[in-house]
Curated annotation (Swiss-Prot):
PROSITE patterns cross-referenced by the UniProt entry: HISTONE_LIKE
A GO term for molecular function: structural constituent of chromatin
GO biological process, one term: regulation of translation
Name of the protein in question: Integration host factor subunit beta
One Pfam family hit: Bac_DNA_binding
Keywords: DNA recombination, DNA-binding, Transcription, Transcription regulation, Translation regulation
Designated gene of the protein: ihfB
Family annotation (InterPro entries): Hist_DNA-bd, Histone-like_DNA-bd_CS, IHF-like_DNA-bd_dom_sf, IHF_beta
Top-level lineage group: Bacteria
Family listed: Belongs to the bacterial histone-like protein family.
Source species of the chain: Colwellia psychrerythraea (strain 34H / ATCC BAA-681) (Vibrio psychroerythus)
CDD domains: IHF_B
GO CC terms of this entry: chromosome; cytosol
Subunit comment: Heterodimer of an alpha and a beta chain.
């Protein structure tokens, strides 16, 4: 599901809100989440999961075109850990 599909489905379910209001709300939620993660804060949404940052240590990578070694610096990457409720729901519907 894309962001625009999410906005469309929410606007259909929440008929008292316009599509523009739903779009603005979704964008604001995502912006607040990005700001929290960029400050190193953990985001927990009970029943859904948590977002946090994981550190990737510096390493030597390879340029796929040339095969040449490339030094890659350490960095933080966003990580999502699904909650128990979400995992169970997904496993029920997929199985």
């Amino acid at each position: 599901m894309t962001k625009s599909e999410l906005i469309e489905k929410l606007a259909d379910k929440l008929s008292h809100l316009s599509a523009k209001e739903v779009e603005k709300s979704i964008k604001e939620i995502l912006e607040l989440m990005a700001q929290s993660l960029s400050k190193g804060e953990r985001i927990e949404i009970r029943g859904f999961g948590s977002f946090s940052l994981h550190y990737r240590a510096p390493r030597v990578g390879r340029n796929p075109k040339t095969g040449e070694s490339v030094e890659l610096s350490g960095k933080y990457v966003p990580h999502f850990k699904p909650g128990k409720e979400l995992r169970e729901r997904v496993n029920l519907s997929v199985a």
